[in-house]
């Protein structure tokens, strides 16, 4: 059935309906036509608003206003990452060629001294007052367990400018062997890492040092195993 025939059928049906209903039916048909026209006009207007983006941007703008704190925080994080830090920082590594001693180097890969920190006489010199994260790690190695009890020690000391006395800030003790040595343990290799870290109030001119014992058990075979550093907070 074609569209023209459908329209003709509708017109004939409306004409027959109007003849049977009289003036009252004609009035009802007029109200029905007006309601249909308003419905079609409203749907067309809504489609145009959606199609031309009149409604969409308002919703997006409202959504952006609702999430403005999150967007501001993300923008602040991105901006702060572009600002270079002027806080003192140091990260020194052990000299792999210094057998039997712990010698710190800053002119190596992954090592640095920045914003006033100095490495002097194997000690880190604090450039300004403030809170600092102080940390260090060492790795010991050995072969088997001797008859005597073995202790491995690692400590970080501070020599303050205010009282010129050496004071331990951090220290740790480990033993690679049990008190009762199991059978066959005298031939097994062992490795023992010790990590130290803490936050301290330091003064300008303070000197920090890291010591170990026994030095001949220090493992310097790989880079990144033995290090010492401070970070201003």
UniProtKB/Swiss-Prot annotation:
Record PTM text: The soluble form derives from the membrane form by proteolytic processing. The membrane-bound form is further proteolytically processed by SPPL2A or SPPL2B through regulated intramembrane proteolysis producing TNF intracellular domains (ICD1 and ICD2) released in the cytosol and TNF C-domain 1 and C-domain 2 secreted into the extracellular space.
Lipidation (N6-myristoyl lysine): 19
Residues listed as glycosylation sites in the UniProt record: 80
Disulphide bond pairs: 145-177
Phosphoserine sites (modified residues): 2
UniProt xrefs under Pfam families: TNF
Site positions per UniProt: Cleavage: 33-34, 38-39, 48-51, 76-77
Record domain THD: where: 88-233
Keyword terms, alphabetized: Cell membrane, Cytokine, Disulfide bond, Glycoprotein, Lipoprotein, Membrane, Myristate, Phosphoprotein, Secreted, Signal-anchor, Transmembrane, Transmembrane helix
PROSITE patterns documented for this protein: THD_1, THD_2
Keyword Lipoprotein carried by entry: yes
Ranges per topology, Cytoplasmic: 1-32
Topological region Extracellular: 56-233
GO MF, one example: tumor necrosis factor receptor binding
Protein's cellular compartments: Cell membrane
GO cellular component: cell surface; extracellular space; plasma membrane
Gene Ontology annotations of biological process type: extrinsic apoptotic signaling pathway via death domain receptors; immune response; necroptotic signaling pathway; positive regulation of canonical NF-kappaB signal transduction; positive regulation of extrinsic apoptotic signaling pathway; positive regulation of NF-kappaB transcription factor activity; positive regulation of transcription by RNA polymerase II; regulation of biological quality
Positions of transmembrane segments: 33-55
Domain of life: Eukaryota
Topology versus the membrane: Single-pass type II membrane protein
Subunit-level organization: Homotrimer. Interacts with SPPL2B.
Function of the molecule: Cytokine that binds to TNFRSF1A/TNFR1 and TNFRSF1B/TNFBR. It is mainly secreted by macrophages and can induce cell death of certain tumor cell lines. It is potent pyrogen causing fever by direct action or by stimulation of interleukin-1 secretion and is implicated in the induction of cachexia, Under certain conditions it can stimulate cell proliferation and induce cell differentiation. Induces insulin resistance in adipocytes via inhibition of insulin-induced IRS1 tyrosine phosphorylation and insulin-induced glucose uptake.
Family: Belongs to the tumor necrosis factor family.
PANTHER family found in the cross-reference section: TUMOR NECROSIS FACTOR, TUMOR NECROSIS FACTOR FAMILY MEMBER
Protein name according to UniProt: Tumor necrosis factor
Organism: Saimiri sciureus (Common squirrel monkey)
């Amino acid at each position: 059935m074609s569209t023209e025939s459908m329209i003709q059928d509708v017109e004939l049906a409306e004409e027959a309906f109007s003849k049977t209903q009289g003036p009252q039916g004609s009035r009802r048909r007029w109200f029905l036509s007006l309601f249909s026209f308003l419905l079609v006009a409203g749907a067309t207007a809504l489609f145009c608003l959606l199609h031309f983006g009149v409604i969409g941007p308002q919703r997006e703008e409202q959504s952006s206003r609702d999430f403005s704190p999150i967007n501001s925080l993300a923008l602040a994080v991105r901006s702060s990452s572009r600002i270079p830090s002027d806080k003192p920082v140091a990260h020194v590594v052990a000299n792999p060629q210094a057998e039997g001693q712990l010698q710190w180097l800053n002119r190596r890969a992954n090592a640095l001294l920045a914003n006033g920190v100095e490495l002097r006489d194997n000690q880190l010199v604090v450039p300004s007052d403030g809170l600092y994260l102080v940390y260090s790690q060492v790795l010991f190695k050995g072969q088997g367990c001797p008859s005597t009890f073995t202790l491995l020690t690692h400590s970080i000391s501070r020599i303050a400018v205010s009282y010129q006395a050496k004071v331990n800030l951090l220290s740790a003790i480990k033993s690679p062997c049990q008190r009762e040595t199991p059978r066959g343990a005298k031939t097994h290799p062992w490795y023992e890492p010790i990590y130290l870290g803490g936050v301290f109030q330091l003064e300008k001119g303070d000197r920090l040092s890291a010591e170990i014992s026994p030095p001949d058990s220090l493992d310097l075979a790989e880079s990144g195993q033995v290090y010492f550093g401070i970070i201003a907070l």
